[in-house]
Amino acid sequence: MEAIAKHDFSATADDELSFRKTQILKILNMEDDSNWYRAELDGKEGLIPSNYIEMKNHDWYYGRITRADAEKLLSNKHEGAFLIRISESSPGDFSLSVKCPDGVQHFKVLRDAQSKFFLWVVKFNSLNELVEYHRTASVSRSQDVKLRDMIPEEMLVQALYDFVPQESGELDFRRGDVITVTDRSDENWWNGEIGNRKGIFPATYVTPYHS
């Protein structure tokens, strides 16, 4: 994933990475610490404060969705429909789930010593570049399957727990409530609505809704 720096940051430790406002950083790992992400800039890797950046929003990035939920989501979609998610078996890595003619297939996104991403031979500086390339080149070696965006649709989720707002602008709900997600560009806090009530809520409090 890629992110845009919102502020300048000067490293104060050897494992941190300095950057300037508006620079584009490649995010390598968001899982170990929600406050510090591992990133790369100009061939250098290090930790960066997550509140100093803004993730570039992509509809195909679903974050911590399970393999099973990815299959449910893609099973009735058109051929080539896809999403990228955080790997369940290897946290910090990514998987590409794609609707193929014979069902949903999952491809592990590999990474070399230079942190370049690849599925087969051609390597890329970012997930964004990998996705764009495979819009015109098959992701599969056994059949011709090119990536195509899912037709946009509202995402429904169901509350796993009660949520009582602590700040204005947050959405109150009870366990079992069904919420329409209107924006999930932030990994931790999503925008949603229940009836005519709108607000933000913690993404960890909900699960994909299956009627």
UniProtKB/Swiss-Prot annotation:
Effect seen on changing residue 199 to R: Disrupts the SH3 domain. Abolishes binding to Dab
Cellular localization per UniProt: Membrane; Synapse
Species this chain originates from: Drosophila melanogaster (Fruit fly)
Pfam families found in the cross-reference section: SH2, SH3_1
Coiled-coil residue windows: none
Protein name per UniProt: Growth factor receptor-bound protein 2
Recorded name of the encoding gene: drk
SH2 domain: residues covered: 60-151
Membrane topology according to the record: Peripheral membrane protein
